[in-house]
Amino acid sequence: MPYPEFVFDRDYFDVEEAIRLKERIRSDGYNSLTDEEKNIWDNGLKACRNASDLNRIGYACSVIADLLEIPMTVKTDWTKLQIPTSSDTQHILDNVQTLKNSVASYTTDMPNVPSNPINTIEKMNDVEKILYKVYTVINIILTDMCVCGETYICEDNRLI
């Protein structure tokens, strides 16, 4: 599986840009945007929870769960027209909590899993920061296993 991407540097400049573009579309129409602005608007504004964010988070959860051999149901086919329900976002948060718990004994340097709803840039940043840190811890463990030769003498291919 390809390396998952993580976005956890959303800030209020991103929020201001989203508001600016939205107001411009409302007042002057979508066609008033430059090609660059249309691309930003069409492909997921960084400060807005959108299908690309949800798919990226779902994919990261899937990759991490596979590495840890944790069975997990994830959704990675969100579309622009789908609006996640409260139970959808709670399912995402539960998955993130499960993955965080799996490496809790290796690090305490992670934010808390936010509460539902995921409706602020801080909460979105925390979700992806947790996934990034879990993925990083797993890679450190795998690297250390290879250095000590453990991967060559194990009788199975389990990570931990």
Where do the PLM segments sit?
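Extracellular "spike/adhesin" assembly and maturation modules
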Residues: 1-160
